[in-house]
Amino acid sequence: MRRLIAANWKMNKTVKETEEYINTFLKFVEHPESREILICPPFTSLYVAGKMLQGTGVKLGAQNCHYEKRGAFTGEISIPMLQEVGCEYVIVGHSERRHIFGESDELIHKKIVACLEMGIRPILCVGEKKEEREAGMTFKVIETQIKLALTGVEEHTDKIDIAYEPVWAIGTGTPATPEDAVEVHTFIRNLINQLNPKNEGKTRILYGGSVNPQNAKEFMKHEEINGLLVGTASLDPESFAKIVYSF
């Protein structure tokens, strides 16, 4: 599979700012078929982004979803709603959802199952906090997060991507080293192969956490890193383009 470079804008950009960004970013996009490019704007910008990205080769994704198709869930958004505006991907279990909004492994599991049932590709985010890393619990934390998220759907791992995002590196300007990332990515790959021996490398494992144009190339030198989930550095179209074409 092609390596995936994903932009997670988080709670940034109005509709007007989204239009300006995409108009600028598309000027930098050449041969998108050589890699998969994904932009995940806030919900209010999904419709206009979907229209502007049609036929460009750049994919559209959402930052979150609910596991039900419809109902009395004030403030939530369903997968069919996302698909109607062109979303092919959705980020599930981002550390900010886990730690700021209290999303549990059980809830994340429900979202993963719903994504698979409804035909949208989830990017499952996993990662350890600083104190867990210092206690030598990195692998245990990640194994638990992955196993709980994928319980009962292990045979469908080929339809899921995983983003390793060490919580201590997100938005701090202090990324994990490429060597740290490779070690964890290798662990995740081995775990996925244990859960589904037929996976055959179809689950891409991305790195996320203070990625920028200066360090992206160092991460992407390693075959164990199948892509990047980019936060702050994706908010500037030229900066994100440099990351996309850093390898």
UniProtKB/Swiss-Prot annotation:
Q: Where is the signal peptide?
A: none
Q: What is its EC number?
A: 5.3.1.1
Q: What reactions does this protein catalyze?
A: D-glyceraldehyde 3-phosphate = dihydroxyacetone phosphate
- UniProt keyword annotations, A-Z: Cytoplasm, Gluconeogenesis, Glycolysis, Isomerase
Q: Pathway involvement? A: Carbohydrate biosynthesis; gluconeogenesis; Carbohydrate degradation; glycolysis; D-glyceraldehyde 3-phosphate from glycerone phosphate: step 1/1
Oligomeric state and interaction partners are given as:
Homodimer.
Q: What is this protein called?
A: Triosephosphate isomerase
Give the gene symbol.
Answer: tpiA
